[in-house]
């Protein structure tokens, strides 16, 4: 499934919803499927629902739709864009009317949450679909023995996006970043725990943060490392040419407008940024730090089966999902978008031929090298909003370093509760 749209207000129906079961062209093929399949696509809460988003989703979905419908011309596909912060409520609301999506393309934590709420059906493991996927991504979606809560579809690593017209290359270390800032280059970061997670490893606070969230005892060393991380953020915020903002949307807008030269971004942002910067857009892994390598979080996009489908819709949805992860489609979508990484283990990424894909692979390797990140993305603890409020209060000076560290540790401890 190539709907790697951005991990707004209500949902946008990109193709007008029609009947749930369609008449389909006449055919004598006993294997032909006839159904209307509604596909729900989760987007980041910071992604504006506008004409640009519609174009992005249409472009990504077009290749998959055209190829799949060449095989199954009697399957009609409709796409719903579901904002991240309203995803669960919207699927619950539609499910009460029996109109929930037949297939969902969402982040793995959302897929887990939907499954725990009884809103999706599991996939069996092993199966022909899961057998061809990287075992590491299967491990991230395993729910119980013999089943996963969704079928992995693609990876969206976090990385650095920069303006080649202003920066010859992206800083390889935090020290280089600070030096470039002092020389007049402008940098932007989002005040958001998961978007700042890459600095936890670079500054030596990742293991401490993960330990607290895992319910381990809080030691003086734990507090010291988390406080040290906050001190670096405060120091960076005081730099004239380093911008910290709570709004990722605002950060991207300012980068597009040429007000900032370098930002942290997610691979799902690349299409929009290419539209604005063209060949000036540069991609690179995030900077390492004095205490270790960068530790960015890579989003795993997952295909989950809805529970309200008719038998015909379920067969068509499963066929579409299986088609989306086959080697040919995974390779085609990777090369076409150059903003997502395949999960099919039989699809090598041609990093020698494509500079942007090489940057994505390097960013993904950073994430895979930091196993402590896994606990930060577990859906059992939806602590992000509380943690982000603490970081924003710290950013605006309402909390000093000690108070912010104490509050953040308490929030992480509460997140560890079952």
Regions found by a protein language model. Name each.
Residues 1-110, 414-418:
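Conserved N-terminal structural module of periplasmic/extracytoplasmic solute-binding proteins
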Residues 106-159, 169, 284:
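Hinge/lid segment of periplasmic solute-binding proteins
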Residues 110-115, 256, 264-280:
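A ligand-binding cleft/hinge motif common to bilobed small-molecule-binding domains
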Residues 125-133, 185-187, 207-228, 275, ...:
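Short, solvent-exposed loop/beta-turn-alpha elements that line the ligand-binding surface or hinge
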Residues 149-153, 158, 175-219, 225, ...:
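Extracytoplasmic/periplasmic solute-binding protein
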Residues 215-248:
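Glycine-centered hinge/linker elements that transmit conformational signals in sensory
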Residues 274-340:
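Extracytoplasmic/periplasmic substrate-recognition and gating elements
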Residues 335-389, 393:
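Long, aromatic- and glycine/proline-rich binding clefts that accommodate carbohydrate-like moieties
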């Amino acid at each position: 499934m190539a709907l790697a749209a951005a991990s707004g207000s209500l949902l946008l129906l990109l193709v007008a919803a029609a009947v749930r079961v369609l008449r389909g062209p006449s055919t004598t093929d006993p294997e032909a499927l006839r159904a209307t399949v509604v596909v729900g696509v989760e987007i980041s809460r910071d992604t504006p629902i506008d004409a640009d988003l519609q174009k992005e989703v249409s472009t990504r979905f077009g290749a998959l739709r055209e190829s799949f419908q060449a095989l199954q011309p009697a399957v009609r596909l409709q796409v719903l864009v579901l904002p991240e912060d309203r995803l669960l409520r919207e699927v619950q609301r539609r499910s009460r009317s029996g109109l929930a999506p037949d297939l969902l393309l969402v982040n793995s934590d959302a897929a887990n949450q939907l499954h725990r709420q009884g809103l999706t059906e599991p996939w069996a493991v092993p199966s022909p679909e899961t057998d061809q996927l990287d075992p590491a991504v299967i491990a991230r979606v395993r729910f119980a023995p013999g089943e996963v809560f969704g079928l992995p579809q693609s990876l969206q690593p976090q990385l650095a996006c920069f303006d080649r017209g202003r920066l010859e290359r992206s800083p390889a270390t935090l020290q280089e970043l600070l030096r470039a800032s002092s020389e007049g280059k402008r940098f932007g970061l989002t005040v958001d725990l998961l978007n700042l997670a890459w600095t936890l490893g670079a500054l030596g606070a990742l293991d401490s943060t993960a330990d607290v969230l895992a319910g381990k005892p809080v030691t003086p060393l734990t507090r010291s490392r988390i406080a040290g991380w906050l001190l670096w953020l405060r120091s960076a915020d005081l730099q004239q040419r380093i911008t910290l903002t709570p709004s990722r949307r605002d950060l991207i807008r300012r980068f597009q407008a040429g007000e900032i030269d370098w930002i942290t971004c997610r691979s799902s942002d690349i299409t929009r940024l290419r539209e604005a910067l063209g060949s000036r857009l540069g991609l690179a892994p995030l900077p390492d730090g004095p205490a270790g390598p960068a530790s960015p979080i890579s989003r795993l996009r997952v295909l989950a089966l809805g529970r309200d489908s008719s038998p015909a819709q379920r067969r068509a949805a499963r066929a579409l999902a299986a088609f989306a992860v086959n080697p040919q489609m995974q390779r085609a979508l990777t090369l076409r978008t150059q903003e997502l990484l395949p999960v099919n283990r039989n699809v090598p990424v041609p990093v020698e031929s494509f500079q942007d894909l090489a940057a994505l692979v390097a960013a993904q390797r950073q994430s895979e090298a930091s196993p402590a990140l896994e606990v930060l993305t577990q859906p059992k603890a939806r602590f992000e909003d509380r943690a982000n409020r603490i970081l924003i209060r710290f950013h605006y000076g309402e909390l000093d370093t000690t108070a912010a560290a104490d509050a953040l540790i308490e929030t992480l401890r509460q997140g560890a509760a079952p």
